[in-house]
Amino acid sequence: MRPLLALLLLGLVSGSPPLDDNKIPSLCPGQPGLPGTPGHHGSQGLPGRDGRDGRDGAPGAPGEKGEGGRPGLPGPRGEPGPRGEAGPMGAIGPAGECSVPPRSAFSAKRSESRVPPPADTPLPFDRVLLNEQGHYDPTTGKFTCQVPGVYYFAVHATVYRASLQFDLVKNGQSIASFFQYFGGWPKPASLSGGAMVRLEPEDQVWVQVGVGDYIGIYASIKTDSTFSGFLVYSDWHSSPVFA
């Protein structure tokens, strides 16, 4: 150990600077000297390693809403869904208007009379059985059309004391003629006839007995002679009367 310490001290003496003013350097450190002049910048060193990842920053403020994209293609048709339950019953609606078809009908009979009627003139049936619309005039025996359409007219006559021939007349023209011979029988006979005809407003229809001796229409308490008519169907929708 001692030889090693002696060698170490020898090395320190031989490597130390020359003695100044014959002073032996002290083994104790002195006061620090003045800072030296800064050295030149050295060359750039090698790049250092990447540092550790930093912590996540705070969320940024929401950006402005962008423009909508183009509509996509229609998707495939889905399966039908289950049938829904029936909804509640709705409120009752207001009553609608009910269209009533036009009407026209009458029936009348002759009063008791044993006097033969005049020929070639309208024959009055003065006792009204039905005439709700007032289209038949019992004083003249004429029916005047107010509702255009097709009508049916019928006459049922009692024949007594003479043969009878009568016509259904429209506006002065015979549309049907009927005859019953009377052979002097003790009891009355009967004669019936009818026809359908189309009428326009203000057309008139009546019964008229024939000329000569064929005027044997009769009416009494037990036997009647009647004239009736009624509308079968109407052309009211296309008539100016209802425009």
Swiss-Prot record:
Residues 99-238 form the C1q domain. Residues 30-95 form the Collagen-like domain. Gene3D superfamilies: 2.60.120.40. Keywords: Collagen, Secreted, Signal. It comes from the Eukaryota. Pfam families: C1q, Collagen. It is found in: Secreted. GO terms for cellular component: apical plasma membrane; bicellular tight junction; cell projection; collagen trimer; extracellular region; extracellular space; lateral plasma membrane; membrane. One of its GO terms (biological process) is inner ear development. Residues 1-15 form the signal peptide. GO terms for molecular function: identical protein binding. Residues 15-124 are annotated as: Disordered. Homotrimer (via collagen-like domain). May form higher order oligomers by supercoiling of the trimers. May interact with ERFE. This is Complement C1q tumor necrosis factor-related protein 5.
